[in-house]
Each structure stands twice: as structure tokens, then as C-alpha cells.
Amino acid sequence: FPDRNSFDPENPGWAWMSNNSIAAKVGTKYEDYVDLIANNGEPGFIWLDVARNYGRLADPADGKDYRVMGFNPCAEQPLESYELCTLVEVHLNRHESKEDFLRTLKFAYLYGKTVTLVPTHWQITNGIMQRNRRIGTSLTGIASFADQNGLPTVREWMDEGYKTIRKYDHSYSEWLCVRESIRVTTVKPSGSVSLLSGATPGVHWGPGGNFFLRAIRFGNQDPMIHLFKAAGYKMEPDLVSQNTTVVYFPVHSGHPRSEKDVTLFEKIGLAATTQKYWSDNGVSVTLSFDKDKETEHVAPALHMYEGQLKAVSFLPMGNKTYPQQPYTQITKDEYNSYVGEIKKINWSAIYDGVDNLEALGEAYCTTDTCEIKIS
């Protein structure tokens, strides 16, 4: 199975359209998979027995999730068959105090809980959602927050934050006349969204280091493509989708440490801390590692933390594992050179019409696109 589904440059779509993880048990012989992981990071591992029996690892086993059959693709949410994710995110790095953080959690929780009240088109899904009311209040910016404030503060905020959400869920579920949520917290991978607030993504350290190119994909019919081209951004056709263009944005993160400065054991340790004190669902974590220096530590790390996580995946560091990766590390000189070549984006052109594409005001807008009229 791992060989068949692993990434193949000659047939990339097969692996990219699947979630290549193994349902492991405590005591699995992880050494059998180290060579595959060192090649391209696959397979990942999920521990269904932990997901079914535990919420937070700081709390006793409760067995509430005995119906769980798997995870969502990024593995932050254990799910029953036909169950959906309901996710909302809080940025740790945007809070001035713990009180400010706890207040944000209230509104994040209320949004997530409200979404569980909305029916879907599938009757079987509605039944599961009404029974579980599962939500995933996620944190991002955890690694940089830990670097700046220390792990004791991280544990304190997480533990008190979790208990605060549980208190709100008890009160508001009674008020709404619905069940309390089976699980309420999680950690998403949060790659793109974290860029908006300058946060490190989810539980990860900055993948691209201090200076990097962030690859973001746009449909070829997206009017933004014309603006990026006019401004001189580096663009190239997506190698997988013929209808998609990859645009590379230069980023100076300014984070205290990047992923290459952090050991494999510290990375998995922070994920376990988050699973223990914050997330009663799961923690989406991809452990980057130095292929030459840390491959020998992969199996020991898994044996050490297999009972303290619900899922984990790996990725060798560097820019050559996969083409068109989300993050490509560059030097300061390369960053300055690229920034010097690009122009300021003319955002007003979206509404003035660009190359026969005109956005119809704010009609039918989602978070990503608006209705487009093709002249």
C-alpha cells in the first residue's frame, strides 16, 4: 500500500488525490516505514484507538468517540462516516492579554456552534451532526507564540482556554436546547490563513524560514491573475491542473525561529503539548526533518509519542521533494531582488475591468471569488 500510493513524479495526481496514512496501533514497528518517509514523507500515521477513547490527553479516557472511522484530509478532526467538519480559527499572536484571548474564544465558539444548527442536504449527515455537534475551535501561531512567551504560558492559555469553551458550551447548549458538543477544539494546518496575521501556521514553525516564496494557486479565469502579471509576479502553469496558475509571493516572516532551526523532537513535543492541553479533536501536524541528520530519529520519535498524538505526518526539508511546494526558502538577496522587480498591485482594476473580465460589484461573493462576467 505505501509503495503503490506514494508520490510518483510520473503520476503525481494519484498520490495528491489521496490521504496516504496508515492506521497504526501503539507498538507498531515504525522502522519498516522510515525509508519511505525519508524519501517523500509518506506514509503518515493515525491512531484510531487514541482518537476513539480520548479527547484531550490531559483528561481521562471517555470513550465518547467510539464511532470514529477516520479523519478529515488534514487529520485535525476525527470523524464518523458522513460527518462534516465545523472549523473556526483564533490567532494566538494577535492578542494583547489572556483576557483578550479568552474573549475571542467566546465569539469563535459561538460561530462554530451556530454552524452546527444549519442542516445539510443529507439526512444521514444531519442526524450525526445533531447528535455530536462537533466543532473545531482552532489555534494558529502556536510555535511563534511559544518562542516569544515560553511553554508555561502556552500551557496556561491552552488549558484555561479549553475550560472556558467547555463552560460556554454547557451554557449555550442548554439555552439553544441542543446537545453539548462531543468535541470542541482542534488545530488546523492553517497555511494560507496564517499569512494574513503574520502567524506561524498552526502548530508548525515557519516552513519557509525568514525569507521564502509562498506559492498560491489561482484558477486561470480568476481576474486576479491579470493583476499579478501586470505587477511582475513570478507565475507558471500548475503541473497538475491545466486550469490553474501558480503565483509566487515573496515573504519576510520575521519569526524568531524557522523550521530548520528546530529539532524533530521539539516539533513533535509541541504537537503533543497541544494535544494534551488544547485539542480534544486532533492536531494537524507535519513534522519537517533534515533528511541527512534526522532520519534515524523518525522511528524513536514515533515510539516516544505514539500514545500522545492522534495523527502525524512527515516531510523532508528542502525545495526538491515536490515540485511547486507551498513554501520555497530563499536568501535575503533573492528576496530583495524579487521585491525590487515587482510593482504595486492596482486593486481598482478588479472593478474597472481587466482584459475583458469585470467583477459585478459585490454580487454573489464568497471568501475567494465573485461572480465574473465574461464580455
Predicted regions and their residues:
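Conserved, charged catalytic cores of large soluble enzymes
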Residues: 1-63, 136-166
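Domain-level cores of phosphate- or acyl-group-handling catalytic modules
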Residues: 1-12, 124-125, 170, 181, ...
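Short, well-ordered loop/turn elements at secondary-structure boundaries
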Residues: 10-11, 17, 29-33, 38-42, ...
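Catalytic alpha/beta core of large soluble enzyme barrels
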Residues: 35-37, 44, 54-121, 131, ...
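Inter-helical turn/loop segments and adjacent helix faces that build the functional surface
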Residues: 94-99, 120-125, 146-157
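Active-site-adjacent structural elements in folded domains
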Residues: 120-132, 179-180
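Flexible, glycine/threonine-enriched loop-and-boundary segments that flank and lead into catalytic domains
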Residues: 164-192, 198-200, 352-359, 364
